[in-house]
Amino acid sequence: MDVSAALSSDYSSGTPSPVAADADDGSSAYMTVSSAPPKRRAGRTKFKETRHPVFKGVRRRNPGRWVCEVREPHGKQRIWLGTFETAEMAARAHDVAALALRGRAACLNFADSPRRLRVPPIGASHDDIRRAAAEAAEAFRPPPDESNAATEVAAAASGATNSNAEQFASHPYYEVMDDGLDLGMQGYLDMAQGMLIDPPPMACDPAVGGGEDDNDGEVQLWSY
C-alpha cells in the first residue's frame, strides 16, 4: 500500500496527521523560536524593519496587517500563505506550513501547534498547505471588540429612533396640526378672535333725553 496515498486519505477524511498524533503522546519535542531563535543577518540594519521581533516567517504590512511565507526545505522557492489581521494568525499559518514541509525538523512559533492544528501530510501540494494554513489562522481569529459592538448597537438604535420620528412627523395628523389646528374647531377660533375686538364706543339713549355728560340712563353697549 502506498504510504503517501494513505496519508492523503487520512488528511482528506479529517483524521489527525501522523505529525500531530506523535506530538500528542509527548515522545519528542519540536524546536520553537524560544528554544532556537532565528538568526539575524549581520551587517547594516535596514532603515525599516518589517520582520516580527518574535514570530518566525511573519512580516508586517501596513496598515496593521501581517503576511507570512515559508521557504521550501531544498530549494529557493517560497510559498506565499497570505495576509492576516494579527501576528498570531500569521504565526499559526507558518507553523502548519513548516510542519507540512519539514516534519520534525520544523522550527515552530508555538509548541502546541502540532496538537491544536490540522496539519497536511508531508509532501502535500502548495494549495493544500495554503488551505490548511488559512484554516489554522481562522481558528485563532480574535473575538470582536465588545466596545465596538456596543457602539454599533447604539448607532443602530439611534438610527431607528430618528426613523420613527420622521415617520410620526409625516403622519397626516401632524400635518393637520401644523396647518392651523383645523380639527372642526374653527368656530371656537372665531369666537376667540371676536373677544379680542374692541367694543363700540358708548352712546346715550335718545329716549332718556340725556346729553353727552348724562350717564344716568341705560346705555346700549352692543348693537347687532
Curated annotation (Swiss-Prot):
Residues 54-111 bind DNA. Residues 1-46 are annotated as: Disordered. Keywords: Activator, DNA-binding, Nucleus, Stress response, Transcription, Transcription regulation. It comes from the Eukaryota. PROSITE patterns: AP2_ERF. GO terms for cellular component: nucleus. It is found in: Nucleus. Residues 1-16 have a biased composition (Polar residues). Its main location: nucleus. It holds the Pfam family AP2. This is Dehydration-responsive element-binding protein 1G. PANTHER family: DEHYDRATION-RESPONSIVE ELEMENT-BINDING PROTEIN 1D. Belongs to the AP2/ERF transcription factor family. ERF subfamily. It comes from Oryza sativa subsp. indica. Gene3D superfamilies: AP2/ERF domain. GO terms for molecular function: DNA binding; DNA-binding transcription factor activity. Transcriptional activator that binds specifically to the DNA sequence 5'-[AG]CCGAC-3'. Binding to the C-repeat/DRE element mediates high salinity- and dehydration-inducible transcription.
